[in-house]
């Protein structure tokens, strides 16, 4: 075990040697653990980190994410923001997507929307990028027209769309995001978000999860 840990520390040293780190204070830690996500979360909690960055690989669509189980555990349970990165250029004046959920009136969803937008805007200042709001909303239940013959699916869909438009517009006004940077589409989030990411050629997607955090969430 000690030999493997020493080998990993040497690998980190070799990796850092490729970069100019003279002006940075870098602490290196190699931990032996059979559940990597727990070791990472313990480190975050111990040092009160505000951002966790991890490499990953992503296919052209969110439907075929190549995230590992560790990635998913960290997204759901890490007590800080998680940045999953892949090989991608970071151009000036790029696009950042803030994926929000405008269909819920619940306070915890509203707070999460605001945190997502705040993180996106903070990153936009660092990267000299523009922020776009993206939201996916569901279609009318398929069986409802059968169970309730007088139910007007078109009227329901139009009203639902307008509700999401109004809620997104309110977020746009609150955070100074113009109408042309507000995007809404009917469908599943895992379909809608990557479609807009491709359409906008986005460099970064900011999204959130509702759930417990920390080791107790495992």
Protein language model annotation of sequence segments:
Residues 4-15, 119, 159-167, 192:
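Short, solvent-exposed amphipathic alpha-helices that sit
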Residues 53, 83, 97, 132-134, ...:
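Hydrophobic/aromatic beta-strand patches that form the interior of the parallel beta-sheet core
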Residues 2, 17-52, 173-205, 212-215:
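Structural beta-alpha unit
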